[in-house]
Amino acid sequence: MSVLDRFRLTGRTAFVTGGSRGLGRAMAQSLAEAGANLILIGREAETLQHAQTELVKLGVRVDTVQADLSTPEGAVTACGRALSLGIPVEILVNNVGGRRVNVPTEDFSITEWNALFNLNLTSALVCAQELGKPMLARGRGSIVNITSIAGPIAMKGIRGRHYETAKAALGALTRSLAADWANRGVRVNAIAPGVFETAPNSKWFAAMPEFRQTFLDHIPMDRFGQPEELGPAVVFLASDASSYMTGATLTIDGGFTCW
């Protein structure tokens, strides 16, 4: 097998949470360009339909599941619908998540804390359970968890540490699952993005413009990442190009964590 052939995903199916827009949409496109069929999970039917219409042009099968993964029940339902398609899912990209609120930790309600943990952490666990069992039965699969550089560090100027805490836990879950499933054919790795030009981040910067410059000043490359710059990394981790790699995290942050 040639080096380039190791990156090919032809005939495999990838389940991408939050796959209809933002970083998830960009990663889904890269997986499709490498030959993977897609099952996109998202909350909004219109956004899913638009993504499906565009991605099928790449010559792959694209199915969509409208679901809200902010509850464990929603994640179970999404996985069940995907499995009911009768297509073996060999790649799971746990991308869905978000900060959503900017509240000081001392004022954070436990109800909201739990809800955001469900979104950023529990959804990944549930999807790994529901889709990981068939992978283990087949002895083959790759799971890619999207963590964040906010896992090992506290982002300056942002209040409320639910996101940092959940993403740190997702990194720990990545390593734990990797150790548990390594000799059963299922690899589990993570990507930790830095600050990227996405719609949610644009909203944050519009509401709090001082943060934009604060973050930019902390990036040695002097720019934010573009969503398509995550694509090659997810293809690498999903493919046989990383066949001897599990429990690892790729940090893609323009050097943010160098300082």
Give residue ranges: language-model regions.
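Active-site helix of classical SDR
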Residues: A128, A166, T174
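Short C-terminal tail/terminal secondary-structure segment
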Residues: S2-R6, R99-N102, V235, T246-W259
